[in-house]
Amino acid sequence: MSELVTVARPYAKAAFDFAVEHQAVAHWQAMLTFCAEVSRNERIAELLSGAVVPEKLAETFIAVCGEELDAAGQNLIRVMAENGRLTVLPDVLEQFTLWRAAQEATVEVDVISASTLKEEQLAKISAAMEQRLSRKVKLNCKIDKSVVAGVVIRAGDMVIDGSVRGRLERLADVLQS
């Protein structure tokens, strides 16, 4: 089993890097899932383990997959067939899925302030958000003079408004009620 993972890893890594670069991780996971299912089919598995010429094997596999594979996916299948590795497609999918999960463990956090924050301030915000979210964070810093002072932090649907503007708005709401 570990030998198959070792064989599958470079293909999965290449596919994942390509997918990230082209912002198509979900699309690639869907393609790999489909290909892994096709490779598990009894008749296809017999074909993969037989003595078929790699070019013919690749074209047959691509034909079976039909429009589920884009041009880049077809290229991956051709390379894997040429190297006799189509049988490890389920392991390629498994490795790809692990890299996707690791990538998605990072949360993008928007930090909006009235002026540029110092490195120490950014480090404290980053550490606090990592602890609060239990995930790694990537800070996207933006400057908005209307904040007046303080910061507004957004991570997904969570907003922490520590700005003077936010405090004034809350004070105005209290006074009007």
Swiss-Prot record:
A molecular-function term among this protein's GO annotations: proton-transporting ATP synthase activity, rotational mechanism
Main location: membrane
Keyword Transport among record annotations: yes
InterPro entries the record matches: ATP_synth_OSCP/delta_N_sf, ATPase_OSCP/d_CS, ATPase_OSCP/dsu
Lipid bilayer topology: Peripheral membrane protein
KW Coiled coil (keyword) present: no
Record-annotated membrane-spanning stretches: none
Cellular compartments annotated: Cell inner membrane
Stored Pfam families: OSCP
Function comment: F(1)F(0) ATP synthase produces ATP from ADP in the presence of a proton or sodium gradient. F-type ATPases consist of two structural domains, F(1) containing the extramembraneous catalytic core and F(0) containing the membrane proton channel, linked together by a central stalk and a peripheral stalk. During catalysis, ATP synthesis in the catalytic domain of F(1) is coupled via a rotary mechanism of the central stalk subunits to proton translocation. This protein is part of the stalk that links CF(0) to CF(1). It either transmits conformational changes from CF(0) to CF(1) or is implicated in proton conduction.
Assembly mode: F-type ATPases have 2 components, F(1) - the catalytic core - and F(0) - the membrane proton channel. F(1) has five subunits: alpha(3), beta(3), gamma(1), delta(1), epsilon(1). F(0) has three main subunits: a(1), b(2) and c(10-14). The alpha and beta chains form an alternating ring which encloses part of the gamma chain. F(1) is attached to F(0) by a central stalk formed by the gamma and epsilon chains, while a peripheral stalk is formed by the delta and b chains.
NCBIfam families for this protein: ATP_synt_delta, PRK05758.2-2, PRK05758.2-5
Family named by the database record: Belongs to the ATPase delta chain family.
Entries under HAMAP family matching the protein: ATP_synth_delta_bact
Designated name of the protein: ATP synthase subunit delta
Annotated source species: Sodalis glossinidius (strain morsitans)
